[in-house]
Curated annotation (Swiss-Prot):
Pfam families: Glyco_tran_28_C, Glyco_transf_28. Cell wall formation. Catalyzes the transfer of a GlcNAc subunit on undecaprenyl-pyrophosphoryl-MurNAc-pentapeptide (lipid intermediate I) to form undecaprenyl-pyrophosphoryl-MurNAc-(pentapeptide)GlcNAc (lipid intermediate II). It comes from Levilactobacillus brevis (strain ATCC 367 / BCRC 12310 / CIP 105137 / JCM 1170 / LMG 11437 / NCIMB 947 / NCTC 947) (Lactobacillus brevis). It is found in: Cell membrane. It comes from the Bacteria. It catalyses: Mur2Ac(oyl-L-Ala-gamma-D-Glu-L-Lys-D-Ala-D-Ala)-di-trans,octa-cis-undecaprenyl diphosphate + UDP-N-acetyl-alpha-D-glucosamine = beta-D-GlcNAc-(1->4)-Mur2Ac(oyl-L-Ala-gamma-D-Glu-L-Lys-D-Ala-D-Ala)-di-trans,octa-cis-undecaprenyl diphosphate + UDP + H(+). The gene is murG. The lineage of its organism: Bacteria, Bacillati, Bacillota, Bacilli, Lactobacillales. This is UDP-N-acetylglucosamine--N-acetylmuramyl-(pentapeptide) pyrophosphoryl-undecaprenol N-acetylglucosamine transferase.
Length: 364
């Protein structure tokens, strides 16, 4: 198999692509892979660091208002399509896969024009602008949430789940809470606003710590590296009990997650793939700062089947956080029901499912 993959801009587009590549290398060790990303996106550092061949093209996103900058965007897009065609002719992929982000638009479109089999992967409940554009040109569309079904051509769609879920499901965890000075036999709530941290989640957690101090359950609060010093400054003079641990980040999150009783966090596609793969009950606080409010729609996909509770960011305070946390952490039966619902949404073989579609395209 010769596979070209493109996706970039955010981790939500990059990590599913990396999980797919990992699964391909496991299935076909002699396969050849080329990752095409943007010059300035996160992928330009993350992908080469994984030892994956990487080529870059220059591209930028459209402004949502009428702007002269959009003329530059069109020019760069057409230039990127031209560059991508050269890369495709040189690499000769059997299939080209796009996982979202503007760069995948140019690469997958170029492949379609060259009659190379194409697949896009849509991680969210609300389809992104790039995948909407590509949907009319590609051969197949892999998707995660049923809410995407009425936004794309149904005859091309295959439900696969998010490849990142398979990575999470395959982890064999040897982690112990004793590494954090906590106990393994006490339920632990993880509060995590993402790798950068989330100001509003951090503020609510800081306000809730005096209450968390007196709970029978444990709390691990991950602030985000950049926000750790600010959080600790806010907590100056506040007692933090032994059942509460504050961390700037967790480097081995896939090993930690299977030990978590419940999680408080955002509703990004990658996070939800990992949460459901491990069957973790969640309290989701969708980011209101994302396109088309897609995190709320992602969260609703879990909440409607009883796998998650939702707190709108506008309603998030120390009091509302404590109330929801107590509701889950003091009720073992509720947590078990939510864990079962979460696990049923998980797709532990998602990367293999996407690969099956890729291999079918190659055969066709």
């Amino acid at each position: 198999m010769r596979l070209m993959v493109s996706g970039g801009g955010t981790g939500g587009h990059i990590y599913p692509a990396l999980a797919l590549i990992k699964a391909l290398k496991k299935r076909e060790p002699n396969s050849a892979v080329m990752y095409v990303g943007s010059e300035r996106g996160l992928e330009s550092t993350i992908v080469p660091a994984k030892g994956i061949p990487f080529q870059a093209t220059r591209i930028q996103g459209f402004k949502r208002s009428l702007s002269l900058e959009n003329f530059k965007t069109v020019y760069l897009f057409l230039k990127s399509v031209h560059e991508a065609k050269k890369m495709i002719r040189q690499f000769k992929p059997d299939v080209v896969v796009g996982t979202g982000g503007y760069v995948s638009g140019a690469v997958v479109y170029a492949a379609a024009r060259l009659h190379v089999p194409t697949l896009i992967h849509e991680q969210n409940s609300v389809v992104g602008i790039t995948n909407r554009f590509l949907s009319r040109y590609v051969d197949r569309i892999a998707y995660v949430f049923d809410a995407a079904l009425d936004q794309l051509p149904v005859n091309k769609m295959v439900k696969t789940g998010n490849p990142r879920a398979q990575e999470a499901a395959e982890v064999v965890s040897h982690f112990s809470w004793t590494e954090y000075g906590l106990q393994d036999d006490v339920p632990t709530l993880l509060i995590f606003g993402g790798s950068q941290g989330a100001l509003k989640i951090n503020a609510a957690t800081v306000a809730a710590i005096p209450e968390f101090n007196h709970r029978e359950y444990q709390v691990v609060f991950v602030t985000g590296q950049k926000r750790y010093d600010g959080v600790m400054a806010q907590l100056k003079g506040t007692t933090v009990a032994d059942n509460v641990v504050i961390k700037p980040y967790i480097g081995n999150m896939p090993e930690v997650l299977p030990r978590v009783a419940a999680i408080v966090g955002r509703a990004g596609a990658t996070s939800l793939a990992e949460i459901t793969a491990d069957g973790i009950p969640s309290i989701l606080i969708p980011s209101p700062y994302v396109t088309a409010d897609h995190q709320t729609k992602n969260a609703n996909s879990l909440a409607t089947v009883g796998a998650a509770e939702i707190i709108k960011e506008a309603d998030l305070t120390g009091e509302t956080l404590i109330a929801k946390a107590d509701q889950l952490m003091t009720n073992d039966a509720l947590r078990q029901d939510m864990a079962t619902a979460s696990k049923q949404l998980g797709v532990p073989d998602a990367a293999d499912r996407v690969l099956d579609v890729v291999e079918a395209l190659k055969r066709d």
